[in-house]
Amino acid sequence: MALLEICCYSMECALTAQRNGADRIELCAAPKEGGLTPSFGVLRSVREHITIPVHPIIRPRGGDFYYTDGEFAAMLEDIRLVRELGFPGLVTGVLTVDGDVDMSRMEKIMAAAGPLAVTFHRAFDMCANPFNALKNLADAGVARVLTSGQKADAAQGLSIIMELIAQGDAPTIMAGAGVRANNLQNFLDAGVREVHSSAGVLLPSPMRYRNQGLSMSADIQADEYSRYRVEGAAVAEMKGIIVRHQAK
């Protein structure tokens, strides 16, 4: 049966995903940055209270995936922490300035991760040649690749995703970016074995007093009075589609 991974940005989101049938969680912070390394407090709380597999993301900042030596050193320390806390896997990605997988740094990441399953995240979609990148990641021992097929969303990139799946069984290709209940069946019919979804919704902040003339964000257009949450009904609907597909 296809595996459903849900991207979560808090303990509350992780609990919602687990209750509604998620098979695995990618744990992140900072949804507006596309996901950054969670804090120690969030990592520890989730490790203690969530029973399904959780893979934290290791990403020190938003933007591109070419990191300074200092940023990369911090990533290795975060990997060691995730390993010490007992998580079964992690999610990360590093590129060279030319858009190739940084194999030298991936070797260090794999050594630091040890027995943990490593997912190479959507840095893959920023690679110059996805097929060369996949071969390199297979050589590195990466367990899976999260990809939209190098398109804005996975529905647009499905043909490339299918080509990547045809390359072989390792790493597993996980489709993500815009995967929802209304298009999930297309991925299942195409033979995608793992899917990744945010299943997210923005809810209004409970704050009654709002200083509309002041922003705490560098982006003055940012809505600071909305909060990201995983929508339990969306997770349950996707899990139901997967179960029915398996029963065919």
UniProtKB/Swiss-Prot annotation:
<dbReference type="InterPro" id="IPR036822">
    <property type="entry name" value="CutC-like_dom_sf"/>
</dbReference>
<dbReference type="Pfam" id="PF03932">
    <property type="entry name" value="CutC"/>
</dbReference>
<dbReference type="GO" id="GO:0005507">
    <property type="term" value="F:copper ion binding"/>
</dbReference>
<comment type="subunit">
    <text>Homodimer.</text>
</comment>
<dbReference type="InterPro" id="IPR005627">
    <property type="entry name" value="CutC-like"/>
</dbReference>
<protein>
    <recommendedName>
        <fullName>PF03932 family protein CutC</fullName>
    </recommendedName>
</protein>
<keyword id="KW-0963">Cytoplasm</keyword>
<comment type="similarity">
    <text>Belongs to the CutC family.</text>
</comment>
<dbReference type="GO" id="GO:0005737">
    <property type="term" value="C:cytoplasm"/>
</dbReference>
